[in-house]
Amino acid sequence: MMRADLSKKPGQVSAMFDEVSSAYDRTNTLLSVGNDQLWRVATTRAVAPVAGERILDLAAGTGTSSAALAASGAHVVAADFSEGMLEVGRRRLAGDDRVEFVHADATDLPFDDDSFDAVTISFGLRNVVEPRKGLDELLRVLKPGGRIVICEFSTPPVPLVRRGYDLYMKAVAPSLVKLVSSNASAYEYLNESIQAWPDQETLSSWLRAAGFASVEHRNLTAGIVALHRGVKPAGRHAAPRPAAS
């Protein structure tokens, strides 16, 4: 079983998501007791997509959130490091030209500078090998004045809620996973990655250090999940990327 830390190997993470791709969405709904759908609605509202905008949905997985964003009439680029997840999304959204699926590394995005009106990532930043480098890349591809929205597991501020959540993830969730997935170790990794992830204020500080302004967050479901928002300063353009050696 992979151990959760901040030095994850990209190939391991990608392979893990390839393995669980077929059951990923229904497993998430089961484990979250349906809250994943509420979190998706909150994220879509925070992004506030507008018809004609170009939006990057990073770590898009099977494209469920991408489809919700595209319903506004925006063009959504659904990028992910797992080809297995992308293939499920391509089949599901076949014929919907508002969503474009792209295989991409979050730390080296294959997109031009200043090319998206909004960028968003849900439950994926903690799986990036270098999450702070991922934030740098999101800033680079975002247009000046554009907005970023991050939905990620976080730290419940109330100790009683935190203890109850920890108990659920350690004692209850593993049994539920066995009902719908043959890869229980992937969801053991999920629990460990949540435990290793920094709290709300730390992620806010990372966003500010990357160059985002007007950074704020609000807790969802008692802080089990947090929604972070920020903007790229209007006068800021991407710095030139280093030439390939």
UniProtKB/Swiss-Prot annotation:
Name of the protein described by the UniProt record: Demethylmenaquinone methyltransferase
Xref: Gene3D superfamilies: Vaccinia Virus protein VP39
HAMAP family xrefs: MenG_UbiE_methyltr
Record-annotated disulphide pairs: none
UniProt: S-adenosyl-L-methionine binding residues: 62, 80, 105-106, 122
Glycoprotein listed as a keyword: no
PROSITE patterns, per the entry: SAM_MT_UBIE, UBIE_1, UBIE_2
Parts forming coiled coils: none
Top-level taxonomic group: Bacteria
Keywords: Menaquinone biosynthesis, Methyltransferase, S-adenosyl-L-methionine, Transferase
Family: Belongs to the class I-like SAM-binding methyltransferase superfamily. MenG/UbiE family.
Pfam families, alphabetized: Ubie_methyltran
EC code(s) of this entry: 2.1.1.163
Organism of this sequence: Clavibacter sepedonicus
Entries under CDD domains matching the protein: AdoMet_MTases
UniProt-listed InterPro entries: SAM-dependent_MTases_sf, UbiE/COQ5_MeTrFase, UbiE/COQ5_MeTrFase_CS
